[in-house]
């Protein structure tokens, strides 16, 4: 698919198509993660600034920026707005852009790690952006404080970012469906192999790896929504300060926070 202004990628494959349109081999998962990380870090930009952000994340040369700047503004600006709406919505419908299940577990886990790396990079870029506000006082006023829950969620995403597919055996009992984000660190080791050498998995191992992968994606979803709710939903933080009564009348606090 060749993307034109007015179209917004809705999943991994469509974002991959857009990247091909702008002659980029960059990871769709990492780009989506970077946008979500920036939003979760309280970054709110114009379409043109989202284009600059996305093209910078992609490491696009100046020629790409000149040729595709308007298209990037349309596509990445609308993508950021749509994803912000999804994160704010209390339907908990947020999903990271990752490959379909017909891709190998190795490719999907690699994309999962790329998504988390993108998120962490985007989140860090948002913090740097806030510090460039006209004054330190304004920057401090615009920045919520990190809760322990947010710090631990970011730490877990950092661990997932380093994950590689386990090639031999894949424990499935390390994940607790009732686990709070503030509990002991996520057992990412279930994806790790001592030497990282790939070989053909037995059927049971493949099924275990698949189950573990899906569980970690669900944890990733909840961790991301927790970070956004407790830190990145800057609009609600400001409204809490200015009009608690108006806030209480809203239905909008997303319930993605883990307690």
Where are these regions (language model features)?
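Domain-length accessory/inserted modules outside core catalytic folds
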Residues: 1-116, 120-259
